[in-house]
Amino acid sequence: SITKSDLVEVGIPVISYGQVHSKRNTGVKVEEHLLRYVPGYYLESYPNALVNKGDFIFADTSEDYLGVGNCVYIDVADTLFAGYHTIIARSNHNEYGKYFAYLFRSSTWRYQIRKRVNGVKVFSITQKILGSANILIPPKNEQAEIVEYLDDICGRIDSIIANIYKRIDLLHEYRIRLVSDVVTGQIDVRDIVIPEYEYLEEEPDEESDDIESVEEETEEQEE
């Protein structure tokens, strides 16, 4: 199978475990930042790892409970591999594929997967577990309406999130530049007076801590 050591700078796109668990993976489409690459000759070496439009790439392990069931919906017809620690899922029907992408993000569907996984620090997801979950299949016109509605609402939310990430990146850049300018003497801070302020202690938020922990883990996995 394709492993992390097989990755190269330029080649055939591949999505692996780390990208599936990326905090920026919406689960409903292939995005540029999710792609890594393997050599072109892998087309002959690993044909079974190729995915088709309409397929899903699931992570077969998760280091946290919230990540159980994470996947990427393949909404493009490009040549693309499923990489290490992944499971390829294909529909036996002609239903609206993106409807399933949204369904797989729902807590109702994921509950079925989570209650069947095994593990303590690492949870394992198998084809059998995925296949044992029940799914809701409304009429095709209803699937299309559901997708259209969620695309609109989630698209707005994703746009806001993307803008926030951009601002965070700019703040990181500003902090780095500020530190550099101060320590190299480009900014003279000898006569700067820091105004008095009151330090407010925040009550610990367990849910927030869990989310931050998950984000730190997924950042490591994305590499």
Language-model regions, residue ranges each:
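A short beta-sheet element
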Residues: 16-17, 42, 46-105, 124-126
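Hydrophobic pocket-lining residues within nucleotide cofactor-binding pockets
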Residues: 20, 130, 183
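Short, solvent-exposed loop/turn positions at domain surfaces
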Residues: 1-2, 44-45, 119, 156, ...
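Periplasmic-binding protein-like
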Residues: 109-112
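Amphipathic alpha-helical coiled-coil/heptad-repeat segments
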Residues: 137-223
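A short glycine-rich beta-alpha junction/loop motif
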Residues: 79-86, 117-145
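Low-complexity, Lys/Gly-biased intrinsically disordered segments
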Residues: 1-28, 39-46, 61, 214-219
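Non-catalytic DNA-recognition/assembly elements of restriction-modification systems
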Residues: 1-5, 9-10, 132, 136-140, ...
